[in-house]
Amino acid sequence: MQLFVRAQELHTLEVTGQETVAQIKDHVASLEGIAPEDQVVLLAGSPLEDEATLGQCGVEALTTLEVAGRMLGGKVHGSLARAGKVRGQTPKVAKQEKKKKKTGRAKRRMQYNRRFVNVVPTFGKKKGPNANS
């Protein structure tokens, strides 16, 4: 049966179905020059094991296998490396409860005391509560 292998270029292989994935990798290594240990053979997006035969993997006639190069990993570039970094480093501080604001009669009493009772007499023109002096 015919099998298509897409690596850097598209290749057509004649196989019986009893070949292992490792044998396909060796064949691709001779065609493309990619070492077999650096190859990942994919069938419909899922990687295939080296020991499995093509028949066990469900490879049929005119199926396309994709060969991807194994990438070195371990380093993430850009904003993904910093995602959640600040929030994770910041220590959790318990919220402080605010004092309840007075309402009604008690609020009016505070206003009266502030405006008329606790007033210190000053010289000059009387200034408003928001004046910058």
Swiss-Prot record:
Keyword field: Cytoplasm, Nucleus, Ribonucleoprotein, Ribosomal protein
Protein's name according to its UniProt entry: Ubiquitin-like FUBI-ribosomal protein eS30 fusion protein
SMART domains, per the entry: UBQ (SM00213)
Biological process terms in GO annotation: antibacterial humoral response; antimicrobial humoral immune response mediated by antimicrobial peptide; cytoplasmic translation; defense response to Gram-positive bacterium; innate immune response in mucosa
Lineage: superkingdom: Eukaryota
The record's account of how the chain is modified after translation: FUBI is cleaved from ribosomal protein S30 by the deubiquitinase USP36 before the assembly of ribosomal protein S30 into pre-40S ribosomal particles. FUBI removal from ribosomal protein S30 is a crucial event for the final maturation of pre-40S particles.
Basic residues composition bias: residue spans: 97-110
Any Pfam family the entry gives: ubiquitin
More about this protein: FAU encodes a fusion protein consisting of the ubiquitin-like protein FUBI at the N terminus and ribosomal protein S30 at the C terminus.
Family: In the N-terminal section; belongs to the ubiquitin family. In the C-terminal section; belongs to the eukaryotic ribosomal protein eS30 family.
PROSITE patterns, per database record: UBIQUITIN_1, UBIQUITIN_2
InterPro entries according to UniProt: FUBI, Ribosomal_eS30, Ubiquitin-like_dom, Ubiquitin-like_domsf, Ubiquitin_CS, Ubiquitin_dom
Record organism: Mus musculus
Gene Ontology CC entries for this record: cytoplasm; cytosolic small ribosomal subunit; extracellular space; nucleus
GO molecular function: structural constituent of ribosome
Disordered, as annotated region: 84-110
Residues bearing PTM N6-succinyllysine: K125
